[in-house]
C-alpha cells in the first residue's frame, strides 16, 4: 500500500458521534497510553512532519481526530489513556467517548494499539487490549521506541508483551521506531488486510 503524503487532511476533531465524518472509507483507530508516541507514529507513517501535532505534554489529544489518508482510509487518533494529571471526570468523559466510538462505529476495521517496547504493558494497556477483544475489534500491536532497545533483545521484549497482554494468536505484533522509519511497508501491509 502506498500513500501520497500530500493527500492527507485532518477532517475533524470530534467529541460525539454526530460529528463523525461520513467518508465511506474504512477506519483504523490508533490507541495507546499518553506519551507512547501516537502522533509521532502517525507522522512517520504518512511521511509528514507535523500532520498530527506532537506534544511534550502527555494527555494532550482530547478529541477523536479523523485523518483522511489519501482517500484510501481514515486514521482515527484516540485520546491517550493512563495519564494521571487528567481529572477523574475528564477520564470518565474520555472513556465514554472512546467506548461509544469503538462499540458503535461500523467503519472501524482495525485498532493499532501502541505500547512501549521497553517496558511491561501497563494495567491500562492490558485493559485496553481486553476491551478491544470484548468488542471483537481486530487489534494490531505496535511496540514503539525500538531504537532504544539493543537489537538482540527486541524479540524477547515482543514475546513479553504478547504474554502480558495474553494476545490472541490472530492478532499481530511488530516493533517499530519512528526514528529508523524502516518498517512502514510491513505495517501498511497489515493494515491493508483489514480494509
Swiss-Prot record:
InterPro entries: G_ENGB_dom (IPR030393), GTP-bd (IPR006073), GTP-bd_ribosome_bio_YsxC (IPR019987), P-loop_NTPase (IPR027417), Small_GTP-bd (IPR005225)
Molecular function (Gene Ontology), one example: GTP binding
Domain of life: Bacteria
Keywords assigned: Cell cycle, Cell division, GTP-binding, Magnesium, Metal-binding, Nucleotide-binding, Septation
Pfam families, per database record: MMR_HSR1
Domain EngB-type G: 24-195
Keyword Cell cycle among UniProt keywords: yes
Cofactor(s), by name: Mg(2+)
Binding annotation for GTP: 32-39, 59-63, 77-80, 144-147, 176-178
Binding-site list for Mg(2+): 39, 61
Gene Ontology terms: cellular component: cytosol
GO biological process, one term: division septum assembly
Residue ranges crossing the lipid bilayer per the database entry: none
Keyword presence, Cytoplasm: no
Family: Belongs to the TRAFAC class TrmE-Era-EngA-EngB-Septin-like GTPase superfamily. EngB GTPase family.
Role description: Necessary for normal cell division and for the maintenance of normal septation.
Name of the protein in question: Probable GTP-binding protein EngB
Lineage: Bacteria, Bacillati, Bacillota, Bacilli, Bacillales
Amino acid at each position: 500500500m502506498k500513500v501520497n503524503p500530500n493527500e492527507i487532511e485532518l477532517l475533524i476533531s470530534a467529541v460525539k458521534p454526530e460529528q463523525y465524518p461520513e467518508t465511506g472509507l474504512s477506519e483504523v483507530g490508533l490507541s495507546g497510553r499518553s506519551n507512547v508516541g501516537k502522533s509521532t507514529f502517525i507522522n512517520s507513517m504518512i511521511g509528514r512532519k507535523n500532520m498530527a501535532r506532537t506534544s511534550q505534554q502527555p494527555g494532550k489529544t482530547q478529541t477523536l481526530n479523523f485523518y483522511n489518508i489519501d482517500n484510501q482510509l481514515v486514521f482515527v487518533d484516540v485520546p491517550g489513556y493512563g495519564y494521571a494529571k487528567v481529572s477523574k471526570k475528564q477520564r470518565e468523559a474520555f472513556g465514554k467517548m472512546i467506548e461509544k466510538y469503538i462499540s458503535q462505529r461500523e467503519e472501524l476495521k482495525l485498532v493499532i494499539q501502541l505500547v512501549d517496547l521497553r517496558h511491561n504493558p501497563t494495567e491500562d494497556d492490558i485493559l485496553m487490549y481486553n476491551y478491544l477483544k470484548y468488542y471483537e475489534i481486530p487489534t494490531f500491536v505496535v511496540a514503539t521506541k525500538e531504537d532504544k532497545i539493543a537489537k538482540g533483545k527486541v524479540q524477547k521484549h515482543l514475546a513479553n508483551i504478547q504474554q502480558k497482554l495474553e494476545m490472541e494468536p490472530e492478532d499481530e505484533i511488530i516493533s517499530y521506531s519512528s526514528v529508523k522509519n524502516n518498517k512502514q511497508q510491513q505495517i501498511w501491509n497489515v493494515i491493508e488486510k483489514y480494509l
